[in-house]
Amino acid sequence: AGQSTPLAGGMAIAQNSPVDVRLAMLGGLLHDIGEAYIQAQYLDGEEPLDLLGHKHMMVHPRIAQLLLSATTDYPATLCRAIGEHHERQNGSGFPARLSGDAISPLGMLLAAVENTMSLAPAPHAPLTRASFALRVVPGEYPDRFSSVVFNMARNAHEQVPTNIRVPAAAALHHVNTTLQAAQQTARALQTNIGSTERKAIVQLALDRIARLRQAWNALGVWGLSPEQLTPEDHFEMDLAGVELNQRLYELQRECMLLAENLTQAEKTELSPIWADLKVKHA
């Protein structure tokens, strides 16, 4: 929280953001207060949360919003934004899967702060990692906030690891084959038959896979031999593998959550989608 406060204030000041600096700093301080009501086993784990763990974690923004609304006289703008600090502009966040203008400017700022601070403990180049994470998938975060972290990383002159090597068939190759398989499966399941909810899950998978494909294609180092890649290139490819695998895992989890409202027959029919999206984490 100590670092989140000035970061939120700095983002509010930058580029004439339509956010009150004082509220931004207070939001940076308080945004994770809802985690006090989450079981410790679901906090700061080394492995990504499974579906049950995610269900526990995804309520903490809403808990914080309700807590602050009921026990303080803080403005509704601040309480709402704290409830939105895990949302993403493209609708891939939680708890409400909001998108676009449905997320308040302060909520979007706190979401960028949350993502940045989640990478602060990284042993090497945390700002460079955060800058990449905010920009790698188009549409997740507004440029006005990701550019702040990009400039911070550039001005920090962080040293990137020089001992990273990405084998030809490693993480990014796995991302590529996973995207291809999941896209093919989802396309095969497109039909006018079935419930509206079923159709929405298939369309969600296709839309999100297309975004991840766009991010994968934009890396710009394909066709180069390992000897032609700089340490910065190797580091970026390593970051891309981590971030894109994480997005695949999140999409799998989101599809499975939405499918809980389907009939058993439709769940079974769509299960190949999340089977294809299954990823391995180091």
Feature locations, PLM:
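Short alpha-helical segment immediately N-terminal to, or the first helix within
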Residues: 14, 119-122
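Histidine/acidic-rich helix-loop-helix segments that form or flank divalent-metal centers
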Residues: 28, 68-111, 124-246, 264, ...
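General alpha-helical segment detector with a strong preference for membrane-spanning helices
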Residues: 35-36, 95, 118, 146
